[in-house]
């Protein structure tokens, strides 16, 4: 259990509660969660964050009516800056998007601007939104994370409780290496409902070599851990930085979609540029 799982800031969320679905535009459906909830226990404040980054959302179930009442569909791409006061709670985001379904908008640009304005207000930070017509995306290949996959190891695991113990003494030698490691075994659980969240993770670093078995055991230990996607990525970044002390570090996770949304947070202390193609499970 996360130390803040029962925090009063989470009391008003619709997540985990019976909810009415509205199909007429209602910006009040959006709900934010303070990023400070997970950052404070990690000793991170707005003026000492060791990373930059964003939360990348893909909106697969986005539809509205044009001025003549004809339904429109698009795939949305949202980037929420890491400096925002709040992250966006995903169920509220889904309910908010549903409220577009029977609402008329004059132009696609009006829809984009509406999304951007409302998300900025909820997050209290910088947000960018792009809308894609389906023919722009058709035929795009399934992408893959560049790097060495560490999943195929002949090891036995019987502990699935989160711990940073595996990262202690996880580096060896004085030689500096630069490598990108990938795992598809990341599984955590929703902070509120405890439903499983499935993800692939890419860890790119320069520094003393990280023991791959210990790193994999650490990632697998998230299996019973309850936090939102964004919080898990920041925890992983902070833990690796703290225990392994690489010179540079980038952590990027792409999670499977739920409710027509996927969330793909990344954090880095270098000039990392995330690839945004969807992975095989997305």
UniProtKB/Swiss-Prot annotation:
InterPro entries membership: GTP-CH-I_C/QueF, NADPH_dep_7-cyano-7-deazaG_red, QueF, QueF_N, QueF_type2
The protein's annotated catalytic reaction(s) are: 7-aminomethyl-7-carbaguanine + 2 NADP(+) = 7-cyano-7-deazaguanine + 2 NADPH + 3 H(+)
What's the domain of life for this entry?
Answer: Bacteria
Q: Which SUPFAM superfamilies match?
A: Tetrahydrobiopterin biosynthesis enzymes-like
The EC number of this protein is 1.7.1.13
Biological process according to GO:
queuosine biosynthetic process; tRNA modification
Active site: residue positions: 190 (thioimide intermediate), 197 (proton donor)
Task: Give the primary localization class.
Answer: cytoplasm
Q: Provide the GO MF annotations for this entry.
A: preQ1 synthase activity
Q: Which UniProt keywords apply?
A: Cytoplasm, NADP, Oxidoreductase, Queuosine biosynthesis
Where in or outside the cell it occurs: the entry states: Cytoplasm
The record's Gene Ontology cellular component field reads: cytoplasm
Pathway connected to this protein: tRNA modification; tRNA-queuosine biosynthesis
Offer one Pfam family short name for this entry. QueF_N
Binding residues annotated for substrate, in chain numbering: 88-90, 229-230
Residues annotated as binding NADPH are 90-91, 258-259
The record describes the protein's role as: Catalyzes the NADPH-dependent reduction of 7-cyano-7-deazaguanine (preQ0) to 7-aminomethyl-7-deazaguanine (preQ1).
Q: Which family does the similarity line name?
A: Belongs to the GTP cyclohydrolase I family. QueF type 2 subfamily.
What binding partners and quaternary form does the record give?
Answer: Homodimer.
Instruction: Specify the protein name.
Output: NADPH-dependent 7-cyano-7-deazaguanine reductase
Give the species: Salmonella paratyphi B (strain ATCC BAA-1250 / SPB7)
